[in-house]
């Protein structure tokens, strides 16, 4: 490991919570370089341009085995010390089991679950005492949600995976935290909340004001 190079990796960094995490980690100066990961390279470049910390736009689809392999190869070649991993990549879509396509369901599971696990396993060998893993789950992790059944199940997976991982990391000084927000002011919230499914979710989770 090259201890002189501290890297923070943020997935989903092109928008929403991922972009905000990039801004906050930049402000806190927790790394020598930020790796901003998402599919939209132009959006990543725009985010990187807002930051003072040197930032790298890593255009990658986290459901692609080839793209995950490329990230692993870059980590192996550069051997940095990963101080933060923020897994904010993910998506949700309202609809019941009849209206959401099989492809959308599979993509949701692949990104929200497998992509998150793959990134965590890729980064862990480069972490040491003081490093942090932050997994973006959701308040949906705590209750079955009609019209978001698969999404809620994926976030429950993230919560339980992170809790178990935290126990496995006991004594290493590496921490793993699952973030479980309700509504957050993002592009997804603007579209989803006014929908019929959004009203059902609000009834179950509570109609909090988006933060």
Language-model-detected regions and their locations in the chain:
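Conserved glycine-rich cofactor-binding loop
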Residues: 14-15
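SDR active-site lid
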Residues: 166-211
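Conserved NAD(P)H cofactor-binding loop of Rossmann-fold oxidoreductase domains
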Residues: 88-93
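Residue(s) in the substrate-gating loop at a strand-loop-helix junction
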Residues: 138
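Substrate-binding pocket helix/loop in short-chain dehydrogenase/reductase
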Residues: 96-109
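Active-site helix of classical SDR
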Residues: 120, 154
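Conserved glycine-rich Rossmann-like NAD(P)H-binding loop of the short-chain dehydrogenase/reductase
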Residues: 26, 30-46
């Amino acid at each position: 490991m090259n201890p002189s190079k501290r890297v923070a990796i943020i997935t989903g960094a092109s928008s929403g919570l991922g972009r905000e995490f990039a801004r906050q980690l930049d402000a806190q100066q927790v790394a020598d370089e930020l790796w901003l990961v998402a599919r939209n390279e132009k959006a990543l470049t725009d985010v990187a341009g807002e930051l003072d910390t040197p930032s790298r736009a890593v255009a990658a689809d986290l459901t692609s085995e080839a793209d995950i392999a490329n990230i692993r190869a870059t980590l192996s070649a550069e051997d940095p010390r990963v101080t933060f991993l923020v897994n904010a990549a993910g998506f949700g879509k309202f609809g019941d089991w009849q209206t959401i396509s099989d492809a959308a369901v599979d993509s949701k599971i692949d990104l929200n679950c497998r992509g998150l696990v793959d990134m965590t396993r890729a980064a862990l060998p480069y972490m040491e005492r003081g490093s942090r893993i932050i997994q973006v789950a959701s308040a949906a992790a705590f209750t079955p949600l009609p019209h978001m059944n698969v999404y809620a199940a994926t976030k429950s997976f993230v919560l339980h995976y992170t809790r178990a991982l935290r126990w496995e990391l006991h004594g290493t000084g590496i921490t793993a935290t699952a973030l479980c927000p309700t509504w957050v002011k993002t592009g997804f919230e603007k579209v989803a909340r006014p929908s019929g499914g959004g009203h059902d979710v609000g009834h179950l989770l509570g109609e909090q004001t988006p933060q």
